[in-house]
């Protein structure tokens, strides 16, 4: 590492970055520089594009700047298989339930957010929409459609919603098409998302 002035970032011949503190020493560990948090390993090398376990919590450092993610999603994977993790107010990775921008969301044990999928949590089934928000008081789905009550718990069987009657087939949900459904020995005509199209049933 070439010698530079204190209080600035320097780059070595391998392209790695370090920071010279005001006392002239290389920064190591977590550092606050210009109101941003950064991490430097014991040799002074700056962490970039890395998820690190520090004091029992996970943190992520930006690929370009090295700044710690705070209140920010980290996106991985390609267009068809994107995965999302989230780092909160203190920069640590969020697991389990959280409220982000007013939306109730959930992160699995591996830290990835449940999106556009059904997931069982604490004995209850939930559905999380494409943006990751929990379905509540509404009908939505991906290949199958579900109704969730105000607490997000999925309900099956006959459901009344917005002055319409729906049948949500247990356990897999309603279809997104017009179809005949046998229910307790009677056949009903159902529309997309399980909406009852006529009140007459045929034996």
Each PLM stretch: what is its role?
Residues 1-203:
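Extracellular adhesion/carbohydrate-binding repeat motifs centered on closely spaced tryptophans
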């Amino acid at each position: 590492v070439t010698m530079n002035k204190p209080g600035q970032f320097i780059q070595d011949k391998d392209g790695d970055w370090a920071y010279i503190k005001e006392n002239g020493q290389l920064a190591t560990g977590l550092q606050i520089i210009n109101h941003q948090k950064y991490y430097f390993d014991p040799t002074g090398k700056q962490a970039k594009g890395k998820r690190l376990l520090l004091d029992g919590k996970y943190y992520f450092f930006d690929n370009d700047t090295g700044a710690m993610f705070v209140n920010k999603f980290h996106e991985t994977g390609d267009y068809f298989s994107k995965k999302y993790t989230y780092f909160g107010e203190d920069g640590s990775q969020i697991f389990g339930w959280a409220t982000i921008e007013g939306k109730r969301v959930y992160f699995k044990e591996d830290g990835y957010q449940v999106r556009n999928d059904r997931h069982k949590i604490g004995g209850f089934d939930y559905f999380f929409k494409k943006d990751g928000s929990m379905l509540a008081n509404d009908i939505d789905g991906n290949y199958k459609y579900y109704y969730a009550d105000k607490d997000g718990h999925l309900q099956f069987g006959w459901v009344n919603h917005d002055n319409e009657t729906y049948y949500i087939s247990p356990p897999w949900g309603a279809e997104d098409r017009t179809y005949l459904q046998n229910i307790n020995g009677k056949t009903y005509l159902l529309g997309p998302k399980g909406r009852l199209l006529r009140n007459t049933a045929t034996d």
